[in-house]
């Protein structure tokens, strides 16, 4: 396995520990809330939550912000734009767009684990315009066409 080093900056509102893998085979690292005061996410509402960190990803890498399954199943808290994408050239604070799909208000306290961050490599492409596409068994069938 290749380990890529990524620079991370702790901002003034940072507290706690840097994102880290919970187990040897974890794909994501937990992101910690860095809000000064508790933030209430009302039922069916969205809030932007600071993390207190900024990163400098290498070229051809992105960070994906995804929900934590425990928050989703127990409280209906998820990432509104899942997965959120942090581009390699972004240097600002990483913030998480959380939405409360539950029926009760939910309070985000400083230091709470709010989301997961996955670092992934990607490739850029160049479009080749064509008047036809290669046929496949699936064809243009979508939205349940292969079974429900």
Curated annotation (Swiss-Prot):
**Is Magnesium among this UniProt entry's keywords?**
yes
Q: Which UniProt keywords apply?
A: Hydrolase, Magnesium, Metal-binding, Nucleotide metabolism
Q: Which HAMAP family match?
A: dUTPase_bact
State the CDD domains in the record: trimeric_dUTPase (cd07557)
Q: Which residues bind substrate?
A: 68-70, 81, 85-87, 95
Q: Which NCBIfam families match?
A: dut, PRK00601.1
Whose protein is this, by species?
Rickettsia africae (strain ESF-5)
Q: What is its EC number?
A: 3.6.1.23
Entry-linked InterPro entries: dUTPase, dUTPase-like, dUTPase-like_sf, dUTPase_trimeric
Q: Identify the cofactor(s).
A: Mg(2+)
Biological pathway: Pyrimidine metabolism; dUMP biosynthesis; dUMP from dCTP (dUTP route): step 2/2
Question: Which family is this sequence assigned to?
Answer: Belongs to the dUTPase family.
User: What Pfam families does this protein's entry cite?
Assistant: dUTPase
Q: Per the record's keyword annotation, is Hydrolase included, yes or no? A: yes
On the tree of life, the source organism's domain of life is: Bacteria
Put simply, this protein is called: Deoxyuridine 5'-triphosphate nucleotidohydrolase
What Gene Ontology molecular-function terms does this entry list?
dUTP diphosphatase activity; magnesium ion binding
Known function:
This enzyme is involved in nucleotide metabolism: it produces dUMP, the immediate precursor of thymidine nucleotides and it decreases the intracellular concentration of dUTP so that uracil cannot be incorporated into DNA.
Tell me what reaction this enzyme catalyses.
Answer: dUTP + H2O = dUMP + diphosphate + H(+)
User: What are the BP-aspect GO terms?
Assistant: dUMP biosynthetic process; dUTP catabolic process
């Amino acid at each position: 396995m290749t380990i890529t080093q990524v620079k991370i900056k702790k901002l003034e509102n940072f507290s706690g520990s840097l994102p880290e893998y919970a187990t040897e085979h974890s794909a994501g690292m937990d992101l910690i809330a860095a809000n000064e005061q508790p933030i209430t996410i009302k039922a069916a509402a969205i809030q932007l939550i600071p993390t207190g960190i900024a990163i400098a990803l290498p070229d051809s890498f992105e960070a994906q912000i995804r929900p934590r399954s425990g928050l989703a199943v127990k409280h209906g808290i998820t990432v509104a734009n899942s997965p959120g994408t942090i581009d390699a050239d972004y240097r600002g604070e990483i913030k998480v767009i959380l939405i409360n799909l539950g029926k009760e208000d939910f309070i985000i306290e400083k230091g709470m684990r709010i989301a997961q961050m996955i670092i992934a490599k990607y490739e850029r492409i160049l479009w080749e315009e064509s008047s036809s596409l290669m046929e496949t068994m699936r064809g243009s069938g979508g939205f349940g066409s292969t079974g429900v």
